Structures are given as structure tokens and as C-alpha cells.
Amino acid sequence: MNTTPPVRLTLDKVVVRVIQVPLRRPIVAKLGEFKNFPFILTDVHTKEGVIGQSYLEPYRASATKSIVALIEDMAEQQRGKRVAPFDRFEEAMRSLHLLGRQGVMLIAIAALDMAMWDALAKASGLPLVVLLGGSVGPVRAYNTNGLWLIPIERVADEASALVAEANFKALKIRLGRDSVKDDLKAIAEVRRAVGDDIILMSDFNQGLSFNGAKRRLHQLDDQGLEWFEEPIVFDDFAGSARLANELKTPLQIGENIYGPRHFLQAVAASAADCYMPDLERIGGVTGWLRSAAIAGAAGLSMSTHLYPEFSAHLMRVTETADWLEWRDWGVPFLAEPFELRDSAIHIPDRPGAGIAWDEAAVKRFAI
């Protein structure tokens, strides 16, 4: 019988750093173009010597200053308290009653939440997925490291390269070009390059008006796409519900949903057929687990957005887990990136979430 006492950790201090990493394939989307991407690295130090780690992807470097300040402020409020993510999450959310529970406030909570879960798993000597009651193993993934709104003549070669990166069986293409004819041409180029057996997701990055989406999605509805992602502005749940009800291709939203209650509002509105929460907006590990319970009860599939390392652990304890979104943006600053093989990400059998910083790279990318 194991008589080891339960792991008890106490939050001591938090160290937050900002880096900016060049992208292997620049983002070209309706919401903007990016050649570099900022990251916020959070290290939660405990009095027991265990350090939990997480990173955020705030999109714009100009946003990092305010987010870092909030992380540090919230950490100071929790200093000296038990590393108990559920308790700290509730405490932080209650503190926002008068300020609101969305935007950068929830993003700061997510940074601390993920790092605390990492610390607990490390202290327990277990991979995060095992601490959560699951098992280490592969998680099927699609490759979204390209196929942005690039010139159509480049689409075929890029699709072939993306499949070859890890024998991927699924890719994501960005749509919403100047005309539906151009969207159809881009889809045809992908099919010509990789064949009909490769699953193809599509993402509009909120680039269409409701009426524009209604026209265009009906014209694309027979293309055999896995889903239409965020065709219209993310918080128009009523508009999304109308589109989802009219189309045979599943409608996917979720990366811009803030927290479990906002997630429940989307589900109650029948805003989509499937959901893909983003860990920094949904509220970290705790926010994901609560949202996944809602999705499971409703029978709605859950895919991930960004954060493939933490997300892999969570997918293996999510009842309606569907697809993990693979992006390699974190690889340049991680000491031991996760293995990608046969269209799946493989969770390493090591304590915690499995991430650690390559300090030389962090120093090189610091801003």
C-alpha cells in the first residue's frame, strides 16, 4: 500500500517572459498577415521547488504588456496559497465579477492555471493526462502549418509538403478568397496534389458577412469538407446557428469563446455543430475540462486550437474528442518538442505537460 502523503504545493512566485518567434510559413489570413509570433512564457515557482510552465500566444506583441501585468497581479494575489487549480480558478473568476470574465482577464487566468496543473503533475511524477485520469498515447492530428491565403499556384506544392511532414491524413485550408471561384480552385489544387483520401478542413477566419457566408457556403457545401470554421464574426451565435441549420457541412466555432459559461451560451444557442476551444481563452486546463463536460453531455465533438502539447493531454480525457490542431510555432523554443508521426501527436511519458524551455532559444527570441 502506498503511504506517500498527497502532493502539497504552495505558490511562491511567478516569472513571466515575452519572446517573438519567426514563423516557418507566414500567416496570410483575413484577419492579418504575420511573419513573427509573440509568446508569453510563464513559470510558476513553488516553495517546494517544483516549477510549473505554460505559454500563451497573444497574436500581437503590443498585447503582451497588459497580459503580463495581469498575470503578475493575479499571481501576487495567489502567492502563499495552495497550488489547487480548481480553487484558484474559482477564486480568480469571482474576483472578476465587476470587471468582466472575458478578454485578457481570462487569458491571464489561463496562463496560471496551465502552469499550476503542470506543477501538480510534475510533483506527482505523472504525465498530466495520467493525473487527470487518462493514459499516455497518440492523439490524431491535422496539419495547419500552411495553406493560408497564398497564391493559388502555390497551393498544390504546399499541400503535398504538409502531408509529408508526418504522413498527415488531414489538412486545413483557409478560404474566403476574392470569389467563390477562387476558393473552388484552391480546393481543387489541394485535391489534385494529395488526393481525395486526405481529409480537408476549411477556415474562413471570420472573413465573411452573414449574407456573404450564406451564399458562399451553399456553393461550397458539396466539396466534402470536414467543416466550415468561423465563416462569420465569432460572437454572432444566432447567425452561426442559422448557417449551421441550413448546411450539410458541419459548422465549427470555438477558438474565440471565453470560458465555460460563454461556451454553454454557444451550445444553448445551437451556434455550431462542433467546437474547438482555445486554451488561453477557454480558461486553461480547468476551463477546458468544464467545457468538455458540457460538450460531452450535449454530444458535441471537441477539437483543439493551438497549444498542441497541453491539448494532447486534454484530448485523451475528453469524451467527444475529435481532432487536434497541429502547429509547430512552439517548436523553436521548446527543449523537447513532442513527436509527430503517422498523423498523430505522441504524448511523452514524462511528468507534467511535457514542456520545458530551450533557454538559449528563449534568450535569442526575447523582446
PLM feature segments, named:
Residues N2, P6-T10, V14-V21, E33, ...:
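Flexible C-terminal active-site loop/helix
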Residues R8, K13-V15, H45-A123:
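Metal- or metallocofactor-binding catalytic centers and their adjacent structured scaffolds
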Residues L11, G49, L112, G125, ...:
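Conserved, mostly hydrophobic/aromatic
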Residues Q20-V28:
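Short Pro/Gly-enriched beta-strand edge/turn motifs at strand-loop
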Residues I40-T46, F338-L340:
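Short beta-strand elements
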Residues S54, A141-T144, K169-I173, L200-F204, ...:
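Hydrophobic faces of well-ordered beta-strands that scaffold small-molecule active sites
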Residues L131-L247:
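Metal-dependent enolase-superfamily TIM-barrel catalytic cores that perform enediolate-based chemistry
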Residues H218, G224, D235-A344:
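Shared catalytic-loop signature of beta/alpha-barrel
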